[in-house]
Amino acid sequence: MSVAISIKNAVKRYGDSTIIPDLSLDIREGEFFTLLGPSGCGKTTLLRMIAGFNSIEGGDFYFNDKRINDLDQAKRNIGMVFQNYAIFPHYTVRQNVEFGLKNRGVPAPERRAKSEEFLRLMQIENLADRK
């Protein structure tokens, strides 16, 4: 199996606190991988670093041998389900639903059709234009 995600010497700090001091790991293609640890140990921080939502203070992050440290988050092609409330309050419900598709360059008519499908599936089509 080839390595799909490789992290070498990752470091993350918040002020004077080092959350991730020096982490290296390889996750192979098709491998089932779990991050386990107590609250505040850096699990979500690491996932946010991989997705591009948090800065990387040290180390190198690779997807299939391609370094992604400086790759824009929209081009990383990673989905993330947030633990807490994570919508854009200035967007409508539909715009929030379409956000990921728009970042991936999906044409507007296709985004609209997909958002309609998802809104129907969730039975919230009546809320589509609400902010």
What residue ranges belong to the model's regions?
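The feature captures the beta-strand-to-loop junction immediately N-terminal to the Walker
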Residues: 36-38
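ABC nucleotide-binding domain "signature motif"
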Residues: 57-67
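Short coil-to-helix segment of the ABC ATPase nucleotide-binding domain corresponding to the Q-loop/switch region
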Residues: 91-99
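Helix-to-loop junction immediately C-terminal to a conserved catalytic motif
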Residues: 51
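Conserved ABC ATPase "signature" region
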Residues: 65-67, 102, 107-128
